[in-house]
Curated annotation (Swiss-Prot):
It holds the Pfam family Acp26Ab. The gene is Acp26Ab. GO terms for cellular component: cytoplasm; extracellular region; extracellular space. One of its GO terms (biological process) is sexual reproduction. InterPro entries: Acp26Ab (IPR008392). Keywords: Behavior, Cytoplasm, Secreted, Signal. Changing residue 90 to E: In strain: AF1, AF2, AF3, AF5, AF6, AF7, AF8, AF9, AF10, La14, La31, La32, La60, La106, La118, La125, Ma6, Ma21, Ma24, Ma31, Ma37, Ma50, Ma56, Ma57, Ma74, TW1 and TW6. This protein is transferred from male to female during mating and may affect egglaying and behavior after mating. The keyword Secreted applies. This is Accessory gland-specific peptide 26Ab. It comes from Drosophila melanogaster (Fruit fly). Changing residue 80 to V: In strain: La3, La10, La13, La15, La27, La28, La31, La62, La105, La106, La116, La118, La120, Ma3, Ma6, Ma18, Ma23, Ma31, Ma37, Ma43, Ma56, Ma57, Ma60, Ma74, Mo13a, Mo29b, Mo34a, Mo40b, Mo52b, NC-002, NC-003, NC-004, NC-006, NC-008, Ny2, Ny4, TW2, TW4, TW5, TW8, TW10 and TW11. It is found in: Secreted, Extracellular space; Cytoplasm. Residues 1-21 form the signal peptide. Induction: Up-regulated in response to mating.
Length: 90
């Protein structure tokens, strides 16, 4: 009879400890901006960028991801790539 009571108490303690888990955290953020202008009778994109950030702990470790994209009709490909690199380092 004593063994049964000890097993029940031990089981209750184990269930109580294992059910006390940390909360799952997930945060997502997204922003986008665009500017266009008529130049020489044509609508040109001065800049178009979007940024997405997310943080979660699905694996038990906080994981942060950052994605950014940039485009422009009036900038050179080298300038566009430079801006993309700066956005991805933020």
């Amino acid at each position: 009879m004593n063994y049964f009571a000890v097993i029940c108490i031990f089981s209750c303690i184990c269930l109580w400890q294992f059910s006390d888990a940390a909360p799952f955290i997930s945060v997502q953020s997204s922003s986008q901006s665009r500017s266009q202008k008529v130049m020489n009778g044509m609508l040109r994109t001065l800049y178009d960028y979007s940024v997405q950030d997310s943080v979660n702990d699905a694996t038990g470790h906080l994981i942060q991801t950052h994605k950014a994209d940039f485009n422009s009709d009036v900038m050179s490909p080298d300038e566009i790539e430079s801006v993309r690199q700066q956005l991805n380092m933020a």
